[in-house]
Every structure is written in C-alpha cells, then in structure tokens.
Amino acid sequence: MKLVQVPVGFELELFASEPMIINPIAFAWDERGRLFVIETTDYPNEIRKEGGDDKIKILEDTDGDGKADKVTVFAEGLNIPTSIMAVNGGMLISMAPDFVFLKDTDGDDVADVQEVVMTGWGKFDTHAGPSNLKYGFDNKIWGVLGYSGFDGEVSGKKFNFSQGVYRFTPTWENMEFLGRTSNNTWGLGFSEDFETFISTANGQHSVYLAMETKYAKRTVYKGTPNTATG
C-alpha cells in the first residue's frame, strides 16, 4: 500500500486482509454496498474438469468503520474464476470454459442458482482467458480476452476470436467482438465520455479503442487473393 499513488485529496485505507481473504483476483460491489471477492488458490496451475478450491466471499462492514468485519462464503467449489460483476440480481463470473450466473434466491447469502449462460472460452493458458467483466455506458456487458480465445455460439451465431474486447447484452445475447489487442489482455476501463481503454499484462500498458473493428475493415470480394468475402 505504501507504493500506491492516489489523487490529491484521497486516502488509501485497508478494508480487508488475510486470513479473512486470501489470493483475491477480482471483486464487485452489489447494490447494498457489499464486496464480492473471488478468492483463488487454483490459479494458475490447478485446472480441473470438475469442482475446485476457489470461492466467492461476501465482505461486509457492519459497524460503519470502513473495515470488513463479516465474511460469508457466497459460492465455493469453483475453478479459476477470473472476473465478477453484479447483474440481474446476482453475480456473473468468467470461469473458462464457461460464464456462470450465480444468485441467492432465499436470502441466506449463499448462491443457490448456478447457471452456465455461455460456453466456449479457452483455458489452455489460464493467464490469457476472459476477464474484466463490467457494464458499459450502453448498458451492455463488456469484457476482454487473451490468446486463449473464444470458440462458441451465442444467439445462434458462431464466434471465434481472441486477444481483444467484446460485449453482449445482460440477457447473454448479441455477442460483438469489437477490436483486437495482443496476447495477455487483462485491463478494461472507460472515461467519463465512454472512451474505451484496454491494457495487456505485457507490452501494452494502455491501448485506446478508437472504433470498432468492423468500421476499419475494407471490402473484400470473392476472387481476390484474400479468402474473406464482402
């Protein structure tokens, strides 16, 4: 914390630490001001076909002192979840090869709904999977992806892409691949004017997404050396 720089007028304070939470990889706040944190001990090497040792914990400040004093295990038995966001009254997580929707319906703060809403995310390198799920100002869900790629079907349409930024609706439909970056893409952020910035873990600390890829493509016709068709 000593090396973290914050804007003038802001202070950095510790909210939670071990043993309450270990190895946090991503977090999201819900509408009640509770912090949902992905805790992973499987990342990056323990790839499992079923089950796992990773969890999502709810951290709460119940006495208003700015520090977490209550922890609840929202979901467990997970394997390398890499992103989390609040949506549709629950939490959406990226956990390659799936995106999974988790929801508590009986008020005990434990997810009793666990639904795979999208599948096809690559897992051959856990460092380069899907991450940074968040709402855009267009009320669509945005995310980024590394070279592990996506090869799946959304809304009856086949997609195959990697290393870039994508978005889809909160009903898990209408996937759009918006633009490419490079290799190990993990960062995604928006300015106040909804300008989009992406970063990778190596080589590209900040990339500006000026426009969607579809607007930069040239028309290509059958019979040209290029195999694409316009």
What are these regions (language model features)?
Residues 1-230:
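Beta-propeller domains with acidic blade repeats across secreted/periplasmic ectodomains
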